[in-house]
Amino acid sequence: ADTSKVALQGESLLRTSKVDIQLGEPQLRVTTNLRLRPWLFRSLLGEVPAYLDITQVGNILFISSSGELSGVFYQAWDALAQEKGLHLVVTVFNGSYIGYITPDELYDAKYHEVREMNWFGPGNGDYFDRLIQEVILKAEN
C-alpha cells in the first residue's frame, strides 16, 4: 500500500501503550549444542528488557518491538490489520534489543542471524506472533 496517501478516517484517535514481554532465560548459542549460561550472558550484555511500544493514530497502528522480527511474519500481520481496516507499521530496535525473532520452525536453521542472534531460545517466534496478533485484534478502528 502507498502509505504516503493514507488518510485518517473519521475523528482522529490517538492511543499509546507499552506491553512488557516476559522472556525465558537467555540461551545465546555458541555452537549447535553449546550455549552461554544465563549468568554469563547477563554479565556480558546486562539485563535486556523486552517490550512492545504501541501507538495508534486514527486507522494507522504502529507496533515497535525490542526484538528484530523476521520479515516472514509481516504478510500475515498486515492481512489481519487490513481485515480490521487498519494500516500496520511494524518497526524494531525500540530502545532495547533482545535478538532476532524468527518463526519457531526456523530455530535450528543454519542461517547466521538465526543461530547467533536468537538469544532467548525456541518458542519466541510463536510467542511474538501471538502477541502482535493480539495487539492488532484489540486495536480500534
Region spans (language model):
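Non-catalytic substrate/cofactor recognition surfaces at enzyme active-site rims
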Residues: 1-141
